[in-house]
């Protein structure tokens, strides 16, 4: 059976992944924020799932069984793609993850900045009055 390690904590997600991969892949969760954490907890992993964990050449070359890096984000700039390619390791990512949410947030921030909402908010909180 294959082994995957999820290197981050997300409420309720682990159970869903374990259920979806039942009988095919054992899924464990170990929060890894450093290269040493990843090397320690993912030593026998066939696959790792990450968000922003540092998957450097050192890390990739220290995981002998690694076959797949699954980035659960749009970006994958934290993965050394050359090191992964040299080892024949596939790298995946969620190409359109959160794109609508991010676009909504950026649009709201642009409007708030343009209308000076942040400055007005600070002024009202500081002076305790609305005088505009």
Model-inferred region functions:
Residues 1-45:
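N-terminal glycine-/charge-rich "phosphate-binding" loop or analogous flexible N-terminal tail
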Residues 27-33, 49-51, 125-132:
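Short gly/ser/thr-rich secondary-structure transition/capping motifs
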Residues 50-51, 67-73, 93:
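Short beta-strand elements of ligand-binding domains
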Residues 77-89:
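Rossmann-fold NAD(P)-binding glycine/threonine-rich loop
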């Amino acid at each position: 059976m294959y082994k995957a390690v999820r290197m981050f904590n997300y409420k309720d997600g682990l159970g869903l992944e374990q259920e979806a991969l039942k009988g095919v892949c054992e899924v464990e969760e170990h929060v890894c924020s450093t290269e040493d954490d990843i090397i320690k907890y993912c030593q026998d992993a066939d696959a790792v799932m990450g968000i922003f964990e540092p998957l450097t050449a050192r890390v990739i070359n220290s995981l002998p069984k690694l076959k797949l890096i699954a980035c659960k984000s749009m970006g994958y700039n934290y993965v050394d793609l050359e090191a992964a390619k040299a080892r024949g390791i596939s790298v995946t990512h969620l190409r359109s993850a959160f794109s609508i949410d991010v676009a909504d947030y950026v649009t709201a921030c642009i409007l708030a900045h343009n209308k000076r909402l942040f400055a007005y908010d600070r002024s009202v909180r500081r002076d305790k009055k609305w005088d505009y």
